[in-house]
Every structure is written in structure tokens, then in C-alpha cells.
Amino acid sequence: MTDDDRIKLEPSWKAALRGEFDQPYMHQLREFLRGEYAAGKEIYPPGPLIFNALNSTPLGQVKVVILGQDPYHGPGQAHGLCFSVQPGVATPPSLVNIYKELQRDLNIPIPSHGYLQSWAEQGVLLLNTTMTVERANAASHAKKGWELFTDRIIQVVSEQCPNVVFLLWGAHAQSKQKLIDGTKHLVLKSVHPSPLSAYRGFIGCGHFSRTNSFLEQRGLGPIDWALPPL
């Protein structure tokens, strides 16, 4: 049995990514993670949620891709969806700014929580390009192999899905534009919603209304960006 037969992954993604789990980089990543766990380090998100973005948004249902960098590194925050936090956790500053732009753009009231699962279930792939992190140690799992895996995910979406909107916020996300076929998809770029940069172009970008206009023009249902109460 190959390694990818043991990975608990939504079937359409498992088929599309078949073979990735047997690549040398993935063996190296797996050994790195085993070593971190064996050393008693606390790794986020919890193991069953590492692939939550893929398991929540099957490949054939992807309408929008939002790219993050690595998971939140505070206790109880990360659950495998970029920018999102688990119920009961304070909304992080970048997500507060995303909500401010949603309110400005679409007049959507600012939610009382930061749990974006409903976006994922509507076809918004909330993908961190590094999928794990050590507690209180930002970017600790960068350049360990995850980026090769998530680059392949972006390529698969570009190749196999029609009419996807890619929202690339900040330089790191924009570095992935080369993986996307701009003749098939809509690529929208702005600065990152971080408090350090949000008011230099993220607030006012109109990405949410532009996303829905693009989807509706192609006969696809818009995203309901309003989050249900918890």
C-alpha cells in the first residue's frame, strides 16, 4: 500500500493528488513532522484538521481560492482554513480587516466570530501554503516541503476547474500567480489585509463584489459572504 492510500483525504482531491504522497519531498516532510511530534512540540492545527481546506471544499466545487501563508500559532486558533479561527476564539486582526472590506463592499455586518467554515462549504478554498506550524513559532514549518504540495494544489485547480477566482493578498500569495492560467480564471490582487498594510489598498479593493460578478456572469452561483451566527 502506498502512502497516499493511508491519507484521509476527500476523494476528488485524493485522486487528483495521487502520487504526491510518495514523492521524496513528502517523505522528508513526514519525517520532519514525526520528529517534531516525538520531541513533544505542539503542532497546529490538530492532526485531523491539517487537510481541512481540502476536505471541506471538494475539487469539483472550487469557485474561489484565497491563499494564506501558514496557520495561526496560538492555542485553539488554527483549524486548517486560512484566516479562519475556531469558534470561541477572538477574531484575528487580518480577518477583522477582511470583515471591514466586506462591510464596505457588500454592506455585510461584521460577524461576532472568525469561523469561516461556511465559505469553505460554498466552494471557497481557504488554503495556507504551509499547512502546519509549531506553537508560538511563526513560519517554523516553512520550506519543509509543504509549499511544493500546495503549489501542486494550485496547479490542479488551475488545470481542472473552470472559471475560478483567485484572491492573492500580499506578496507571498502573489508569488503564486505563475501557477495560475490567467486566460481561464480571474486573478485579483491587493496588499495583505494585515493592519500593517490594509489601508494601503486592501480596504477599497472590492474583491468580494467583483468575485460574485464574475461567477454570476458565468452562470455560477455567487458566494454568500455573510457568515451564519454560531
Curated annotation (Swiss-Prot):
Family to which this protein belongs: Belongs to the uracil-DNA glycosylase (UDG) superfamily. UNG family.
Alphabetical list of SMART domains matching this protein: UDG, UreE_C
Keywords annotated in UniProt: Cytoplasm, DNA damage, DNA repair, Hydrolase
Protein name as annotated: Uracil-DNA glycosylase
GO MF annotation list: uracil DNA N-glycosylase activity
Coiled-coil regions, chain positions: none
Record's keyword annotation contains Lipid metabolism: no
UniProt-annotated catalytic positions: 70 (proton acceptor)
HAMAP family the record matches: UDG (MF_00148)
